[in-house]
């Protein structure tokens, strides 16, 4: 007899993997601080403002380095690394056919 596989275990495993991946993505992004409300003390407002400042600094921080988009990756594969900088630093007199 041939045992038939039921699809529900595979569906459950796939759903759990998707939920796990979504959970890690949600935890990676910082949450916005809660507002203290209209009747907050000056100390609570100062603490809220420092939390907001830290939140904004995290969300809008500059990312240093070259960003890799699919276009730049393909141009690096085809033309070699730093193909854009080669063209910008060359002069028109560097070409041998000019002389």
Swiss-Prot record:
Tissue: Expressed by the mandibular venom gland.
UniProt-annotated location(s): Secreted
Propeptide residues, chain positions: 68-99
Tyrosine amide PTM sites in chain numbering: 64
Primary residence: secreted
GO MF assignments: neuropeptide hormone activity; neuropeptide Y receptor binding; toxin activity
GO CC annotation terms, alphabetical: extracellular space
Function: Shows a potent unique triphasic action, rapid biphasic hypertension followed by prolonged hypotension.
Record's protein name: Goannatyrotoxin-Vere1
Source organism of this protein record: Varanus eremius (Rusty desert monitor)
Lineage of producing organism: Eukaryota, Metazoa, Chordata, Craniata, Vertebrata
